């Protein structure tokens, strides 16, 4: 996202640079190891979830200036949904539409997961607030919003470094990303102006977070950042 703003002398900005979500680290058979999931090549086989990416924000105490939504975490067989140009988060994606979790709208997080969820991912946070808490430690935790300083959600217990691989595992990225579940679990939604959804069961990839622009000449592209991490760049045009 890109825009032009008029800022006055002594304006103090809060800037959040979104972080990528964590890889799955759970390995089959409970091996104790310090190797990464990529080095082992076992976590994808076990279908554990991954963390959703965090959104990037610039705001002050009275105004929200701009937001770039984070992408959802990938799952076995499905890529996470990119951060969106528009304001709303997207739904999770996976082979069974019954287990899709809806993205948030209007600055709110992805929809709450219900008690019948089996290894759900954590929903992405929105500007207005964070989502619901996970329903058990095997699930991914929701990402935090501004009141909790945008901390990414925790990973499911066995996907957090307790069952092979280094901690903290499949955590959500800083900027409100949701954490990935353990075992055959779903991945986290991306944080953003509105949060991405997370699936309720296996092989659900996370939805992307929404974006926002409150300035002049706004422009943006869905999935427009090819880098792993978010970025906030401020260029002074004139005094």
What label would you give each PLM region?
Residues 1-138:
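Secretome/extracellular-domain signature
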Residues 17-19, 197, 236:
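Conserved "cap/hinge" positions at secondary-structure junctions
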Residues 46-49, 183-184, 222-224:
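Short Gly/Pro-enriched turn/cap motifs at secondary-structure boundaries
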Residues 56, 67, 226-239:
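Short, structured beta-strand segments at or near domain termini in extracellular proteins/domains
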Residues 83-89, 103-109, 155, 175-178, ...:
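Collagen triple-helix signature
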Residues 137-187, 191-205, 211-215:
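Extracellular trypsin-like serine protease catalytic domains
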Residues 205-210, 214-227, 235-237:
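Extracellular (secreted or membrane-anchored) zinc-dependent metallopeptidases
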């Amino acid at each position: 996202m890109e825009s032009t703003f008029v800022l006055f002398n002594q304006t103090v900005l809060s800037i959040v640079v979104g972080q990528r979500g964590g890889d799955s680290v759970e390995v089959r058979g409970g091996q104790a190891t310090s190797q990464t999931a990529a080095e082992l090549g076992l976590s994808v086989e076990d279908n554990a979830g991954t963390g959703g990416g965090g959104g990037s924000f610039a705001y002050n105490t009275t105004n929200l200036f701009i937001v770039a939504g984070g992408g959802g975490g990938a799952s076995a067989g499905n890529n996470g949904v990119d951060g969106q140009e528009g304001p709303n988060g997207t739904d999770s994606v996976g082979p069974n539409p019954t287990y899709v979790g809806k993205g948030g709208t209007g600055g709110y997080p992805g929809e709450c997961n219900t008690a019948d969820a089996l290894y759900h991912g954590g929903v992405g946070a929105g500007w207005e607030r964070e989502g619901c808490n996970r329903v058990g430690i095997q699930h991914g935790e929701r990402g935090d919003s501004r009141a909790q300083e945008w901390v990414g959600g925790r990973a499911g217990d066995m996907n957090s470094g307790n069952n092979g691989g280094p901690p903290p595992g499949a955590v959500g990225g800083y900027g409100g990303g949701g954490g990935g579940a353990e075992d055959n679990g779903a991945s986290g939604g991306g944080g953003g102006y509105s949060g991405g959804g997370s699936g309720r069961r296996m092989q659900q990839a996370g939805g992307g977070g929404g974006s926002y622009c409150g300035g002049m000449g706004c422009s943006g592209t869905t999935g427009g950042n090819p880098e792993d991490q978010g970025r906030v760049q401020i260029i002074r045009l004139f005094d």
